[in-house]
């Protein structure tokens, strides 16, 4: 009997994952991560995956379905890998995606290590995605049945080794079906609301988190147009992101948007909306899933943020770590620090971190 460690957050998806795998004959162990930094008070309510009540919810579900449950203290590695990266990206005038880093470094590295230490064959999560093992020698990541819930954008960084030890049973179900299963399993959390915020910033106010915990991260500087004319003053680059319109404090008689964050000049560059669009980007820290490496240009569809639609593009190799992406049509607010993920139909080809746009 294969043993699987299920990453249980206390939410509907991971709870149903554990119950489904037990029904399918796996020896299931539940594991919940403690990752909330000590300097931020963890919420008591049911809001986020890190709340104290969520750990209790996970324990209750594990007891309800009759499986062992462990709590793993991953605060140190979470701070080192996720929070420090989050802070450094803002420090370098980029807009990070901490969920991508968390999946790569915490769930599918640190937690997988715990799973292997427990002699588990697999780790399982409640992600809406499909993992297909040993397809022509590859472990593939594919889009979920529920296109509105598909989470492959957050998972493009998984390696072949990680995928070979990963199960994602919810990929073939809709969210509505999963909630019904939670109800059928008798879980009291079947109507629990989904967490929308960054888990370590439960009020979703990331500038408050940065200003309170990392004072001096950003310094005031000029707001400039694309010709270099100074139009005003900003309160720190981490308060802004590409495409932002609100909160600029600039009135030019027409709508203006953040076009670029210039770290060298500590300047926020603004312009009319057409200047927010770009046709190309360079991405680095590239990871490939369905191919070994990119040796020649290929056509793909690409997604530049979690909730954006895919767009047709061609990707060109720059070196082993970088690619150039040229879109068929200009894209709005291509944001350094965010991820770009490449698809061939339902299959994830790979992805990387946006370095620059042009």
UniProtKB/Swiss-Prot annotation:
Disulfide bonds join 102-199. ATP binds at residues 7-14, 33, 126. It catalyses: S-sulfanyl-L-cysteinyl-[protein] + uridine(34) in tRNA + AH2 + ATP = 2-thiouridine(34) in tRNA + L-cysteinyl-[protein] + A + AMP + diphosphate + H(+). SUPFAM superfamilies: Adenine nucleotide alpha hydrolases-like. The keyword Lipid metabolism does not apply. InterPro entries: MnmA-like, MnmA-like_C, MnmA-like_central, MnmA-like_central_sf, Rossmann-like_a/b/a_fold. One of its GO terms (molecular function) is ATP binding. It holds the Pfam family tRNA_Me_trans_C. The active site is at 102 (nucleophile), 199 (cysteine persulfide intermediate). Its EC number is 2.8.1.13. Residues 149-151, 305-306 are annotated as: Interaction with tRNA. It is found in: Cytoplasm. CDD domains: MnmA_TRMU-like. One of its GO terms (biological process) is tRNA wobble position uridine thiolation. GO terms for cellular component: cytoplasm. The record marks 127, 338 as: Interaction with tRNA. Keywords: ATP-binding, Cytoplasm, Disulfide bond, Nucleotide-binding, RNA-binding, Transferase, tRNA processing, tRNA-binding. Belongs to the MnmA/TRMU family. NCBIfam families: PRK00143.1, trmU. Catalyzes the 2-thiolation of uridine at the wobble position (U34) of tRNA, leading to the formation of s(2)U34. This is tRNA-specific 2-thiouridylase MnmA. It comes from Halothermothrix orenii (strain H 168 / OCM 544 / DSM 9562).
């Amino acid at each position: 009997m294969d043993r699987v460690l299920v990453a249980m957050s206390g939410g509907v998806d991971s709870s149903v994952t554990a119950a489904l795998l037990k029904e399918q004959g796996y020896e299931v162990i539940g594991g919940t991560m403690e990752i909330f930094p000590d300097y931020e008070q963890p919420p008591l309510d049911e809001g986020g995956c890190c709340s104290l009540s969520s750990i209790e919810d996970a324990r209750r579900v594990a007891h309800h379905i009759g499986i062992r449950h462990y709590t793993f203290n991953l605060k140190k590695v979470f701070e080192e890998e996720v929070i420090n990266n989050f802070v450094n990206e803002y420090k370098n005038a980029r807009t990070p995606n901490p969920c991508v880093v968390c999946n790569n470094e915490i769930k599918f590295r640190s937690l997988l290590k715990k799973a292997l230490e427990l002699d588990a064959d697999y780790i399982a999560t409640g992600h809406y995605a499909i993992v297909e093992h040993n397809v022509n020698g590859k472990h593939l990541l594919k889009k979920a049945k529920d296109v509105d819930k598909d989470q492959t954008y957050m998972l493009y960084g998984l390696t072949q080794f990680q995928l070979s030890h990963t199960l994602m049973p919810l990929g073939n179900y809709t969210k509505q079906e999963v909630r019904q299963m939670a109800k059928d399993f008798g879980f009291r959390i079947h109507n629990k609301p989904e967490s929308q915020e960054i888990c370590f910033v439960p009020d979703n106010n990331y500038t408050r988190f940065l200003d309170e915990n990392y004072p001096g991260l950003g310094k005031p500087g000029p707001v400039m147009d694309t010709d270099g004319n100074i139009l005003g003053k900003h309160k720190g680059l981490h308060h802004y992101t590409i495409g932002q319109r609100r909160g600029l404090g600039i009135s030019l008689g027409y709508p203006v948007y953040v076009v670029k964050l210039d770290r060298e000049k500590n300047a926020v560059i603004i312009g009319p909306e057409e200047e927010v669009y770009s046709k190309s980007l360079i991405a680095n820290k590239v990871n490939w899933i369905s191919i070994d490496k990119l040796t020649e240009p290929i056509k793909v569809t690409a997604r530049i943020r979690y909730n954006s639609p895919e767009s047709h593009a061609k990707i060109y190799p720059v070196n082993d770590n970088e690619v150039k992406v040229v879109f068929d049509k200009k894209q709005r607010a291509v944001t350094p620090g965010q991820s770009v993920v490449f698809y061939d139909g339902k299959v994830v080809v790979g992805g990387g971190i946006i370095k620059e746009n042009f």
